[in-house]
């Protein structure tokens, strides 16, 4: 189908174009008249935000150019550090360049201040030219790879290394905020991307190889550890170590058996079966030339490093009678028994009715002694039972020393009984598994001698008990009443002792001066 346009339609079209031209001329005439009536020049429209965009239709005047470049802090801008830009793939070390004007705009995202644009391009309405100029007014002279600054495209250290003084590349407003905040401060903020020749940050970049020069215990501790903790973890004391304690002389120590074992019931093979030796052996430590008023002698008795060990030996010679051998109740004066020959040791044990070969063979199969064989000292300020207390030996009568209870009673008969301090070793948990005739050997040792001398622990003193009988269950006569010494030691704080006697059941306590003590305890 063919459409025919008549002459009327063509005339109307031409009339509309003429009307549009007349309206445009009227608008321009009104604008010109308004400008002439106001008397002030009408400034061309510009769109300026921190120097990012300007009107490219006309060149601004010199006054407008100075107004745009004026900021609130000119003193700091005079020394403003250069902006940091990533290097391009073709040039890893951009050079410092400055120019007053640019013919074209840079790529969007890297705006700069003090920029004057050319008339040939409009950043808002016109397309960018094919060739662009320099990317920025300032560019930093970056250090080379010899200064530990490697640039490899997108994996640059600019993104990896944080810095409190570096602002965002695409935001001039953030940089202006930092400039106004630290304008009056002289503190330099280190940044690993600045060159060593920067006038604002002189010699503040981390020195290469500094961590390798430090000692091993000081590396990577200054930033992650509070101050003062390095001395606690890596303490290097310059003060001399305290002098070692003086080694005690072993010639002063003596052991005395205050309470001899008399009988025991054989216990079973299990560890829970306890049949303690009756009465419990009580050993007292004596000192030669002991002075109760001497602090040194009292401190020796209070030494917690003392210990007494107990050994069990079967008696194979039934003809041996208690008291027939020397040293049945007193300590052996020869403290260097470890230096004796084997022949002398065998002869001395034979005099006591003990066969070492039989005792060693028996101990290899099943241990005969069970319980607590090593005990610690128990110190008291006053002697609990002065009637049976031995006298401390002196250096004059050391060869004929006899501290039996009968001799002690005779010594203190005609004068008031003193109550000196005393040190006891109480064996309240000793059991024997097999019936027979046995003797106990007690040895005094001090754990501190290893610390003082660094040598093996010597035996300071030793003492042998009298032979006692271990009976089977059907032959055992029963437990005896507790002695006065046992009762008073329990009253003084040694709670492991078990007391027996008339009126001494569970829940009852017998005082030291009570009249309920058995007659046997009074006689002793």
From Swiss-Prot:
InterPro entries: Velvet, Velvet_dom, Velvet_dom_sf. The keyword Phosphoprotein does not apply. Residues 131-153, 178-195, 393-402 have a biased composition (Polar residues). Residues 248-500 form the Velvet domain. It holds the Pfam family Velvet. It is found in: Nucleus. One of its GO terms (biological process) is regulation of asexual sporulation resulting in formation of a cellular spore. GO terms for cellular component: nucleus. Disruption phenotype: Leads to increased number of conidia and reduced production of cleistothecia. Increases expression of brlA, abaA, wetA and vosA genes that control sequential activation of asexual sporulation. Belongs to the velvet family. VelC subfamily. PANTHER family: SEXUAL DEVELOPMENT REGULATOR VELC, SPORE DEVELOPMENT REGULATOR VOSA. Interacts with vosA. This is Sexual development regulator velC. It comes from Emericella nidulans (strain FGSC A4 / ATCC 38163 / CBS 112.46 / NRRL 194 / M139) (Aspergillus nidulans). The lineage of its organism: Eukaryota, Fungi, Dikarya, Ascomycota, Pezizomycotina. The gene is velC.
